[in-house]
């Protein structure tokens, strides 16, 4: 039997909607990255974009285990002398743009390169319950039910 290599015209893309409420951030990011890359499909081909579209809602209710909300920090530099800035994961989650927390976690779980950048564009993250993608008839994926460790109660 020969090795199958998918062609871009043969790829059937689905839409998934994932509710992030109470789900552990890292476990959620792994599942999203696999869906975006198409690793859940039998026709997965490393050099072809076989991934699906993923819509994540309730990004502000994602769960961080341990003391990561207070202790883990994102750093950036303004470019000016002494311009190092930082923000904790809890501040980002509770701030104006909680979707950036999930976006950054998924981005760091994908390979770096032009194909991964194209796959990453199929991720849409929303802080609240509403999303404008009902016309695509997305399939609801219950990440919390896949594994008991995916969801934390407190």
Curated annotation (Swiss-Prot):
Name the Gene Ontology biological process terms: negative regulation of translation; translation
Its quaternary organisation is: Part of the 50S ribosomal subunit.
Q: Which Pfam families match?
A: Ribosomal_L13
Q: Does the keyword Phosphoprotein apply?
A: no
Annotated function: This protein is one of the early assembly proteins of the 50S ribosomal subunit, although it is not seen to bind rRNA by itself. It is important during the early stages of 50S assembly.
The protein depicted here goes by the name Large ribosomal subunit protein uL13
Q: Which UniProt keywords apply?
A: Ribonucleoprotein, Ribosomal protein
What family does the Swiss-Prot or TrEMBL record give for this protein?
Belongs to the universal ribosomal protein uL13 family.
Starting at the broadest rank, the lineage of the source organism is:
Bacteria, Pseudomonadati, Pseudomonadota, Alphaproteobacteria, Rhodospirillales
Q: Which domain of life is it from?
A: Bacteria
- Output the Gene Ontology cellular-component terms: cytosolic large ribosomal subunit
Q: What GO MF terms are annotated?
A: mRNA binding; structural constituent of ribosome
Listed CDD domains: Ribosomal_L13
Organism name: Rhodospirillum rubrum (strain ATCC 11170 / ATH 1.1.1 / DSM 467 / LMG 4362 / NCIMB 8255 / S1)
Looking up InterPro entries in the UniProt record yields:
Ribosomal_uL13, Ribosomal_uL13_bac-type, Ribosomal_uL13_sf
